[in-house]
Amino acid sequence: MYAIAAVDQNWGIGRDNALLFHISADMKRFRALTEGKTVLMGRKTLQSLPNGRGLPHRRNIVLTGDRDFAAENAEIVHFPVEAVFQAGEDAWIIGGESVYRRFLPLCDRVYLTKIFADGHADAFFPDLDSDPHWQVDTESEIMEDNGLRYQFVEYVPAAPEEDDLLLSEEEPPQEPPQFAPPADFSVFSGF
């Protein structure tokens, strides 16, 4: 799985169920990466899209607890495990906040547009720069669109440190339990 988002300098992704900024290059990148693919989103994200419909030229899967919810051009699922099975490993997580938090541990790569401005958000993406489980893989040059400076950044899961793989000194290796064979096998054979 992959995640894709645009974040402000505080890792904000939205306010009042709308994007914080509209940057043409970000929208083109989103389209190029997700078109023809499966996208997974929450109900509020779907409702924030034009006409509240699934994105064109994509398979849209919407995770919601509302059993009565229906939407055009979208498959509705009600459980995270159902979403994973329906979406498959090549799905793109596109929001919102709770969906990112829930599925980020399953992602192999995260594609972010980092915008160097404060969008006064009320919804946030996890701060990957402060998370030891993620590391920057690639960064574009800093670009500008209508006075907004931004950068494309890709994150990948961090490789575990060697120390993470070793037992600490307080935890000596444990010997496997030793089992003595029973002296009388008749209890096992039914005789």
Label each residue range with its predicted role.
Residues 4-38, 43-159, 164-167, 185-191:
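Flexible, gly/pro- and Lys/Arg-enriched active-site loops
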Residues 178-186:
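Acidic, low-complexity intrinsically disordered tails
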Residues 172-177:
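Intrinsically disordered, low-complexity proline-rich tandem-repeat tracts
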